[in-house]
């Protein structure tokens, strides 16, 4: 949340500090689960806190990126707002679908096949899953903020890819639910 707050401040130094704090958040977010797995100390409380942190952090980061686009004042605020509302909504739906799938897998046997996507699917998933967006989109927006290029096309592509991924996940979830009936 602190990284998002710094990124929202209309100052280039604050935006760079915000990006660095977002990278630090990402490292800490990844490492807490790894430490739990390594030490074999899992708790339901830890999972819930991690989930709650994502529910709070992700919209805050999206709002800070949206506010930076508003500060650029080159783009139509309604289109940018619609893109970010769509991105936040798709991300929250995706997060809930992932959690539903994780809880469903916890109930099943552990000897199921491991999903290994093709390299193109893997690359697509890296682009659309939110923590990865936090790593590259603020840097791209920063380039737009200082006037190097127009990043709205990249934003539109990311939103479209997120919508496709969310729709696909939702379709698969519905298919599983109807098969269970």
How would you label these PLM feature ranges?
Residues 5-9, 31, 63-70, 90-97, ...:
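Structural signature of transmembrane alpha-helix termini at the membrane-water interface
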Residues 2, 24-33, 74-83, 97-110:
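Hydrophobic alpha-helical transmembrane segments
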Residues 1-6, 19, 38-95:
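Multi-pass membrane catalytic core of lipid/isoprenoid biosynthesis enzymes
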Residues 22-28, 84-92, 157-165:
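Alpha-helical transmembrane segments of multi-pass membrane proteins
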Residues 8-12, 38-42, 66-73, 100-107, ...:
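Transmembrane helix-loop junctions in multipass membrane proteins, especially transporters and channels
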Residues 1-45, 148-159:
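Membrane-embedded alpha-helical segments that form the functional core of polytopic membrane enzymes
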Residues 95-181:
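C-terminal membrane-associated helical module and adjoining short loops/tails
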Residues 10-15, 28-31, 56-58, 62, ...:
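Hydrophobic alpha-helical transmembrane segments of membrane proteins
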């Amino acid at each position: 949340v602190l990284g998002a707050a710094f990124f929202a401040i209309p100052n280039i130094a604050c935006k760079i500090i915000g990006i660095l704090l977002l990278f630090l958040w990402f490292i800490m977010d990844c490492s807490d689960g790894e430490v739990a797995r390594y030490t074999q100390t899992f708790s339901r409380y830890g999972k819930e806190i991690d989930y709650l942190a994502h529910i709070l952090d992700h919209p805050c980061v999206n709002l800070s990126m949206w506010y930076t686009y508003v500060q650029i004042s080159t783009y139509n605020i309604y289109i940018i707002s619609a893109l970010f509302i769509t991105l936040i909504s798709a991300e929250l739906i995706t997060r809930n679908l992932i959690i539903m799938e994780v809880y469903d897998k916890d109930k099943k046997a552990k000897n199921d096949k491991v999903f290994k996507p093709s390299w193109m699917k893997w690359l697509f998933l890296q682009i659309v899953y939110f923590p990865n967006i936090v790593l590259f989109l603020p840097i791209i927006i920063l380039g737009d903020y200082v006037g190097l290029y127009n990043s709205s096309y990249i934003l539109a592509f990311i939103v479209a890819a997120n919508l496709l991924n969310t729709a696909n996940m939702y379709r698969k979830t519905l298919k599983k639910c109807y098969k269970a009936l």
